[in-house]
């Protein structure tokens, strides 16, 4: 893990231009992993009395929060757990940049935008790929039958989220450029409203919003991540917190992995538990859960290379300022 930024990227969080860029981007939006933690230096300062976790409305963090096993485990270390909810990954990382949280889980694209904006974090683990858990959808009566027919169309999605990369790769696969569509940057809730009102022609979204759109609206998938992207969920921590409290993060990932292993074999139970928490019926959640990846994995060289490809793609499209080196956040 290197503290030296890439020469083309100013990574000082206090840099006003980068902070302004990050706020602008966010406003437009809505024991397996011990390897990386074992290498973390123990020199940085941090708050050892609490672990502030950023989470989204759906996922294993929601189950972990409901079960309370992490709180019980960390109580013996004198660490209190606090949970803060965010609408999507980019906003969660804005919270990490502001010092509101210490750790969170996001898709594969938010870390790229965040690192480009100077957010000081490290990757501490990831989930297996879940390419079917995100897709480009249209309304059931839409004349659009494939991605190639999105030329000139309005496509809604959360800028800087995992589906942003899916859209770029799907367009590329269909022979289109990003400039060939009209990107409409909306949070999931606003994007769904625009989709229903036919203010946009297509919507790029992830589970469980995807499953809900399919079951409730009859949304038709014209492309998902299969053969295009991995759709990997990453666990990120503020660099200073990770350096000062690796044992706390080890406990977190251990408990997440335990929840994952249980959830993989108890999908109906997880769906029933999540239903009142996320406001979706259990059958819809079961659809989403069956497409998810389970089990915490360590960050590998292959993982870093994949993330670097995403960074290079967005740099080429000039969607992030300059170039960055993903490995510096390892």
Report the location of each language-model feature:
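Hinge/cleft segment of the Venus flytrap/periplasmic-binding protein
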Residues: 322-330
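Sec/Tat-exported extracytoplasmic proteins
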Residues: 74, 100, 105, 115, ...
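Short, glycine-/small- and polar/acidic-enriched structural segments
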Residues: 44-176, 182-185, 201-207, 222, ...
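Pocket-lining segment of extracytoplasmic ligand-binding domains
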Residues: 109, 183-184, 189-274
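N-terminal secretory signal peptides
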Residues: 1-16, 25-34, 43
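Secondary-structure end/capping motifs
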Residues: 243-321
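Solvent-exposed, polar/charged alpha-helical surfaces in well-ordered, non-transmembrane soluble domains
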Residues: 72, 94, 98, 112, ...
């Amino acid at each position: 893990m290197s503290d030296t930024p890439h020469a083309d990227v100013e990574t000082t969080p206090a840099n006003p231009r980068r902070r302004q860029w990050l706020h602008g981007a966010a406003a437009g939006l809505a024991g397996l992993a011990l390897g990386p933690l074992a290498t973390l230096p123990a020199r940085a300062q941090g708050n050892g009395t609490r672990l502030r976790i950023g989470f989204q409305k759906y996922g294993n963090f929601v189950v972990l929060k409901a079960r309370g096993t992490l709180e019980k485990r960390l109580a013996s270390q004198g660490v209190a757990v606090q949970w803060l909810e965010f609408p999507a990954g980019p906003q969660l990382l804005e919270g990490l940049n502001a010092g509101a949280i210490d750790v969170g889980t996001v898709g594969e694209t938010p870390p790229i935008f965040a690192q480009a904006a100077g957010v000081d974090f490290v990757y501490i683990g990831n989930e297996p790929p879940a390419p079917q858990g995100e897709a480009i959808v249209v309304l059931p009566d839409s004349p659009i039958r494939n991605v190639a027919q999105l030329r000139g169309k309005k496509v809604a999605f959360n800028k800087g989220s995992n589906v942003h990369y899916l859209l770029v790769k799907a367009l590329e696969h269909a022979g289109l450029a990003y400039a060939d569509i009209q990107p409409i940057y909306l949070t999931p809730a606003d994007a769904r409203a625009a989709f229903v009102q036919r203010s946009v022609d297509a919507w790029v979204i992830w589970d469980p919003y995807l499953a809900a759109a399919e079951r409730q609206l009859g949304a038709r998938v014209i492309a998902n991540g299969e053969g295009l992207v991995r759709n990997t969920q990453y666990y990120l921590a503020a660099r200073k917190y990770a350096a000062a409290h690796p044992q706390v993060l080890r406990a977190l990932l251990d408990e997440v992995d335990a929840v994952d292993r249980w959830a993989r074999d108890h999908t109906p139970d997880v769906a029933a538990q999540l239903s009142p928490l996320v406001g979706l019926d259990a059958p819809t959640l079961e659809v989403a859960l069956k497409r998810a990846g389970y089990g915490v994995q360590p960050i590998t060289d292959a993982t870093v290379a994949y993330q670097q490809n995403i960074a290079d793609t967005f740099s080429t499209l000039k969607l992030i300022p300059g170039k960055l080196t993903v490995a510096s956040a390892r």
